[in-house]
């Protein structure tokens, strides 16, 4: 007679290991914390670290925001909250933490991932992009450009991107002037301007920059030249697009807007 063992672990849990970035965390009762991670192998996920506040030596990481870690966890089958048993730091990005503007950019990256990416939906492109951008952010002198590139690439990889390669309404190829519709999520050709009377004119150079960034690798995009006019318009359109579709302004974006190098461009 053959028997099948279904639950050798409590609550039908399996032991898993993965790389993660810390999106956010909060206290749970007096001894534990709950952390939202973005992982390479499982996408966005939540884990509880029991006893970390009373016995911090149990874990080899303090799980700072946007830090890169290896974790071992018990994956629960019928719950979205998993039990983390081991956590080892890979990179705390200390160089980023020495600059308030860079901390703001890294925080916005994590908040954007948390808002856009669905729970436990694997997307290695987003994970690899985020870790690459954090490493570059640590050494760059141009964090605002890196943030712009990240937003465009992130939206493209997530499937949440605005439509820049043709008219979002009729599908026609756009060769001349166009407008951008936040409500429809993309460009409108001159024949479709009436579809959204609140759409705004957009420079051809801005459209070309977005398409270049979507098409090319992050490292290649670092060499892309953007004049102040295009950079200004990109910030306006990307931020307004996110605000419209998320129905709020991200908290980290509000902080960045208060810093001189990230002041919101005026229309």
Positions of the model-derived regions?
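Short polybasic linear motifs
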Residues: 1-4
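Non-catalytic alpha-helical scaffolds and adjoining flexible linkers that form interface surfaces
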Residues: 10-267
């Amino acid at each position: 007679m053959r028997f099948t063992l279904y639950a050798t672990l409590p609550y039908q849990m399996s032991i898993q290991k993965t790389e993660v970035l810390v999106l956010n965390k909060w206290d749970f009762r007096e001894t534990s914390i709950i952390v939202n991670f973005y992982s390479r192998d499982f996408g966005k996920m939540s884990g509880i670290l029991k006893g970390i506040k009373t016995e911090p030596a149990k874990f080899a990481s303090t799980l700072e925001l946007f830090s890169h870690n290896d974790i071992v966890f018990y994956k629960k089958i019928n719950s979205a909250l998993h039990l983390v048993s081991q956590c080892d730091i890979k990179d705390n990005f200390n160089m980023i933490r020495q600059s308030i503007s860079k901390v703001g950019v890294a925080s916005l990256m994590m908040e954007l991932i948390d808002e856009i990416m669905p729970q436990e939906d694997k997307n290695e492109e987003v994970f690899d992009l985020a870790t690459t951008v954090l490493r570059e952010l640590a050494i760059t002198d141009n964090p605002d450009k890196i943030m712009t590139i990240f937003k465009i690439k992130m939206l493209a990889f997530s499937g949440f991107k605005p439509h820049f390669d043709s008219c979002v309404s009729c599908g026609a190829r756009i060769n001349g002037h166009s407008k951008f519709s936040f409500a429809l999520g993309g460009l409108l050709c001159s024949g479709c301007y009436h579809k959204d009377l609140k759409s705004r004119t957009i420079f051809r150079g801005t459209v070309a920059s977005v398409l270049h960034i979507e098409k090319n690798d992050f490292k290649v995009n670092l060499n892309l030249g953007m004049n102040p006019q295009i950079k200004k318009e990109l910030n306006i359109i990307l931020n307004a697009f996110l605000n419209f579709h998320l129905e709020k302004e991200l908290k980290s974006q509000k902080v960045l807007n208060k810093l001189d190098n990230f002041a919101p461009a005026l229309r």
